[in-house]
């Protein structure tokens, strides 16, 4: 039997940053797995979570749509948000569909797998855990904030975040995916509310740090109000290492292109500053390139460039499928 040679790439995160990267990676000839945070408790996901006692569907929905291979109109349908008064106000159709599937199947993961077939996704989507959790933050003044959606609204520096209950188990398939990975990618995304909730799952973090695969952090292009105000690129990685309890990130991708001033809004948002000395002290190899995309007037990572840079870290670079 011919030995499987496709590299296994695991991407960990959530929010709006992860789907951008996945759009580039899904075009590559790799085994792609996305491990997605389930800490969201705001907006449509928060309402569903509160009323149905299920995992919040929003981050998972966004990741699945990024990996989908369907008519763009189907994607638009799944992303449609009701702008009406009443019970449907603010709800996203895709969230409702995923929640309905979770009621029709034996588990939430089964629902994800069914929807993966419907959306013809390329890759595998796994929740970091199938158990409910709450993300809390201890602020600089000692106050405690309960709930992911409230943390960035405090206007205070965050000392640390932690989950309740603290013994939440990661989903076994997520742990297995990390164990088999040839490349582990973390981010981009909200540092405290999209990235760290995954790494606070002790068993998952232990598997990541023990892995011999390259571990790459994709540094955010912009700071985030209420989370990473005035942060440098090195500050992001320092916070990750502090929360996990050990240094484990080998490399980071950092955008070098200046973001046009007219795209820096609101005014408190700034481009993440470079700290080469800080990176050196952390022992992290920084890869500086033009990773900026400003398509549609939005600041994002350029998916194709990031995908190429990531796969160049594998022993054999993977080209696009023909």
Curated annotation (Swiss-Prot):
CDD domains linked: YvcK_like (cd07187)
Keywords assigned: Cytoplasm
Pfam families xrefs: CofD (PF01933)
SUPFAM superfamilies according to UniProt: CofD-like
Cellular localization per UniProt: Cytoplasm
GO biological process, one term: regulation of cell shape
Gene Ontology molecular function terms on file: LPPG:FO 2-phospho-L-lactate transferase activity
Chief place where the protein resides: cytoplasm
Gene Ontology cellular component list: cytoplasm
Family named by the database record: Belongs to the gluconeogenesis factor family.
Function of the protein: Required for morphogenesis under gluconeogenic growth conditions.
Full protein name: Gluconeogenesis factor
Organism: Listeria monocytogenes serovar 1/2a (strain ATCC BAA-679 / EGD-e)
